[in-house]
Amino acid sequence: MTNPTNCPIWHDLSAHYQEVLPLQMRDMFTKDGRRFEKFSLEAEGLLLDYSKHRITDETLPLLFKLARDSKVEEWRDRMFAGEKINFTENRAVLHTALRNRSNTPVYVDGKDVMPDVNRVLAQMRKFSTSIRSGEWKGYSGKRITDVVNIGIGGSDLGPVMVCGALKPYAQAGLNAHFVSNIDGTHLAQTLERCDPETTLFIVASKTFTTQETMTNARSARSWFLQAAKDEAHVAKHFVAISTNADEVGKFGIDAANMFEFWDWVGGRYSLWSAIGLSIAIYIGMDHFEELLQGGYEIDRHFKNAPLEQNIPVIMALLGIWYNNFFGADSLAILPYDQGLARFPAYLQQADMESNGKFVARDGRIVQCTTGPIIWGEAGTNGQHAFYQLIHQGNRLIPCDFMMPLQSHYSMGKNGNEHHLILLANCFAQTSALMQGKTLDEAKAELVAQGLTGEALETLLPHKVFEGNRPSTTILFDKLTPKTLGKLIAIYEHKIFVQGIIWNINSFDQWGVEYGKQIAKKILPQLSEDQASTEYDSSTNGLMNYFKSRTQSSGT
């Protein structure tokens, strides 16, 4: 399928959209007492409720036909088989091999990659155990208390999110910090909380040349040497996740403490690899492998479940329905678990870097809208920030709610007061978004409060909620490493399915590279005395304003 909008099934969906558009979900629930039963799925220890969507019995069969006509199943099998489906970079897409707990062979260019995967996992286990046990000592003989991961993009967002989510599994007395931004404030404020004698730095850069990461790493090294003095001590406090042994050695890191990963692992899918070393140290390798197990179980589900019972496929198709037919341009990620506070930011990269494309696989301009804007916040914080827009704004914003049935923490009356309030709010929001509040209902409510006459008529229209706002809800028992692995893998595969239907390459990121190319040219010019004239008038003006303000003041 080169252009999905030209296909008969796309036209069928467009016609069906016109039929569904005037329908109200609250009426659908009233007419069909089995709606939840029909449009929910319990699988892999999760409940997926997609009944609060603007769909009828005819919608999903049409969407499943779209998936089959787009050859989603064939592309899925090609990915798992190690074919180089990332054709613009001539790379396989095999983050799934990193969590292949069956250990069955996975081939790239005729070579089974599983021995290398297992070798690095064993290296991670040995090293992380030595840190956690105190066997590994810093230069002064003290055990490590703080681990600072220096990376950016996929080398940061995944580990940050996972460590935050799985904090209940962390070892007491061992802290994880993450530095990504080239803004020196990020590193400086992190180092303020660390002691050079007890801090380990993980420098995560495949090439060991990434500008932001290596600038931060060099500054961290200088900070460390102000206390340690002897450069030989660097080897006890710095390790690398890289493939560039020469540059790692020049930095002062022992080659034995270089952890490898491969070009068939995309950055935004790399937390499953050695990039997850900070996770393994923080929560322990056993729990890290439970994370892998969760991802693997969803891989099996994605590969083997029919499309009609396939969680990532259903979520992907609902996204297509709203993105391409209803014109929704964003998706709100709303985790009702404070541990998942960074999950929306993680999914921003996973989704927007993957499917933010306007060129199809055949090099032509895509004729339909592709990746949505991903945003969100942990509940209930978001309720007091942006839910107003979702409820009463004039944009359609589909929402993904996710919620554990049990908390890790016992708080409040009977030990579950806080969690019950959280659950009640989550369920209430999905209900309110779906059913809304009619003019008559709002009027009855105001009359019951004693309002009459002009006061009632003035306030009444502002109390109406249109409803018909779609949402998906994912419930799970508890936020464990395995459950988190499942959630991440579900969204990975959802993103993949959407990219196939849109006929784009979800695995390159040339948009990230372009700005960096220009920045490399601009950087030395910021220190030159002469005015900048090379760029457009705006960019020249910004650069020259910087020069006038800093050079004249001597800074």
From Swiss-Prot:
Query: So what EC number does this one have?
Result: 5.3.1.9
Q: What Gene Ontology molecular function terms does this protein carry?
A: carbohydrate derivative binding; glucose-6-phosphate isomerase activity; monosaccharide binding
KW Cytoplasm (keyword) present: yes
Pathway it works in: Carbohydrate biosynthesis; gluconeogenesis; Carbohydrate degradation; glycolysis; D-glyceraldehyde 3-phosphate and glycerone phosphate from D-glucose: step 2/4
Q: Which EC class, in a word?
A: isomerase
Which residues constitute the catalytic centre? E353, H384, K516
Alphabetical UniProt keywords: Cytoplasm, Gluconeogenesis, Glycolysis, Isomerase
Note the CDD domains from the entry: SIS_PGI_1, SIS_PGI_2
Domain of life of the organism in this record? Bacteria
UniProt-annotated location(s): Cytoplasm
Give the record's GO CC terms.
cytosol
Which Cys pairs are S-S linked?
none
Tell me its family: Belongs to the GPI family.
NCBIfam families referenced in this protein's UniProt entry, alphabetically: PRK00179.1
> Which PANTHER family did the record assign?
GLUCOSE-6-PHOSPHATE ISOMERASE
- Function according to Swiss-Prot or TrEMBL: Catalyzes the reversible isomerization of glucose-6-phosphate to fructose-6-phosphate.
What's the protein here called?
Answer: Glucose-6-phosphate isomerase
